[in-house]
């Protein structure tokens, strides 16, 4: 079985709360969300809680509403999620100009073009982004996401010898025997520049 198939199958087997936690970590990494808030998951667990949206973030001064679904009958769930988010936006009296988009992450790979267009129409006047199991699994095979497949799915094809800079610093600094390298430099930066250029 190929690595991507293993990841897809593992994602489909996740319970709702675990999928939500994976999704939050994935979206945080994919879109560099610094302030993602998980309303739909219980702190410190893989359990879900009631809340609309499941998570939200802010990007360029606009709110991103995020919903997750692990249901086998994905279309009714997506329709319901979109309806609930729109109701919540209306109820909370959030202006349309403050809404960036609605993201729906799901575990299906069977949404046809016509169905996608129907969901986009249903989401109007807001932009809809659908992220399915194929896209998530494909991204989890990329170097910058591989730590997520290991942490949330216990799948690792990497020898863990190559990391992006942020992950390397995080891993390096987490060791009790290493001196941290994430410290800010205090001093005259021109000294460093002159050393490098000389």
Spans of features found by a protein language model:
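Mixed-charge (Asp/Glu-Lys/Arg
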Residues: 1-198
